[in-house]
C-alpha cells in the first residue's frame, strides 16, 4: 500500500536513508521531516507491507529556466533490501507520477548514484532516460 508519510515514520525512514548510503538517525529524520512537511512543494510517499514501511519516495517540484513546464524531482527513492523486486518500487513510482500529473507537472527528473546500476536499470525500465551527469560540492 502507498500512503503519505507522517512524522511517526521518522525512525523507519531514517533506516531507509541509511540503507541508501546516507547515515541518518531518527532524531535527524524528524527534523528533516518538519522542514519538508512545512514546504508545499514537497511530497513524501511510503510503501507499506503488513504495517511496516518497505520503501519511500520523496519529491519536490519547481519552475524551470529551460522550459515552461513545471519540473518534478524525485529527491529520494529507496526500497528496503528485503522488499526489492516485489513491486513496492513500481507502486511508489506510479504514485509519484500520478501526484505530479494531478498538479500539472509534465517533466520528472531524478539522480541516482553511479554505483546504483540496478536502480539505473529500474528507472530505464519505467521509461526514464539518462540525460547527463550530476556534480556536487560541499561548501565549507
What kind of region is each of these model predictions?
Residues 5, 77-79, 112:
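Hydrophobic adenine-recognition pocket in adenosine-nucleotide-binding enzymes
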Residues 90, 106, 114-132, 137:
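Conserved active-site alpha-helix within GNAT-family acetyltransferase domains
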Residues 62, 80, 84, 113:
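Residue-level recognition of the GNAT/N-acetyltransferase active site
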Residues 7-11, 15-69, 75, 138-139:
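Acetyl-CoA-dependent GNAT
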Amino acid at each position: 500500500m502507498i500512503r503519505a508519510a507522517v512524522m511517526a515514520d521518522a525512525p523507519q525512514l531514517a533506516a531507509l536513508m541509511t540503507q541508501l548510503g546516507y547515515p541518518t538517525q531518527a532524531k535527524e529524520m524528524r527534523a528533516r521531516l518538519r522542514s519538508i512537511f512545512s514546504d508545499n512543494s514537497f511530497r513524501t510517499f511510503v510503501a507499506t507491507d503488513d504495517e511496516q514501511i518497505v520503501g519511500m519516495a520523496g519529491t519536490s517540484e519547481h519552475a524551470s529556466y529551460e522550459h515552461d513546464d513545471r519540473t518534478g524531482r524525485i529527491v529520494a527513492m529507496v526500497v528496503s533490501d528485503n522488499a526489492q523486486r516485489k513491486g513496492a518500487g513500481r507502486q511508489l513510482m506510479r504514485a509519484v507520477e500520478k501526484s505530479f500529473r494531478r498538479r500539472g507537472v509534465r517533466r520528472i527528473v531524478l539522480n541516482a548514484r553511479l554505483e546504483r546500476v540496478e536502480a539505473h536499470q529500474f528507472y530505464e525500465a519505467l521509461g526514464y532516460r539518462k540525460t547527463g551527469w550530476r556534480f556536487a560540492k560541499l561548501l565549507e
